[in-house]
Amino acid sequence: LSTWLNSNNVSDSVSRLNIGLILAGNIPMVGFHDILSTMIVGHRAMIKMRTNDDVIIPELLEKLTEITPEMSDYYAVVDRLTDYQAVLATGSNNSARYFEQYFSHVPMVIRKNRTGVAILGGDESEDDLNGLMKDCFQYFGLGCRNVTKLYLPENYDLNKIFSASLP
C-alpha cells in the first residue's frame, strides 16, 4: 500500500472529507477498492451498500477494526447518505442519470455500465482462448469489464470458442 500511495503522489495534508460511496453489488466485494482508496488517503467513507452485497464488506471492515480500532473513524456503513462533501457512485446507465441529478451539488464520479470487447485475429492459442472465455464468464459475466462482445475474422471456426468455453 505504501508503494501505491508513493507512486500516486498522495499528500499527507489532505483535508478530511466525508465521501459518499454507493457501491456496485453485482460481484461480492466489488466496491472494496473504492472504500480502501477513500480511507487510505485520509477521507471518511460513508458507505451505502447494495442489498445483494451487504455481508462480506461489513464483516471485513469489522475484522479490520478489531485489528486497528482507530480505523472505525474512517468509515460508516449507512442506509442513507447524508453529510457528504463528494460522491463516488456505481450503477447502471439509468441509475447514473439519477445520481448525476441528485448529487449535482457536490463533486462526484459516477460510473456507468461498461463492457469489454475482444478482437480476434484467428491465430490465438488454446491458452489465449481459455483465458478469453474465463474473462467472458468470470462472475457469470456480471463484471462491468467482462468481455461481452467478440469480433472475429470472417469464416472463423466457432468450434474453437465453444471448446474453450467448456470446462
Pin down the residues of each PLM region:
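Hydrophobic packing residues within well-ordered alpha-helices of enzyme cores
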Residues: 57-60, 99, 161
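Conserved small-residue-rich beta-alpha loop and adjacent elements
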Residues: 4-65, 71
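Conserved NAD(P)+-binding/catalytic subdomain of aldehyde/semialdehyde dehydrogenases
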Residues: 18, 68-150, 154-156
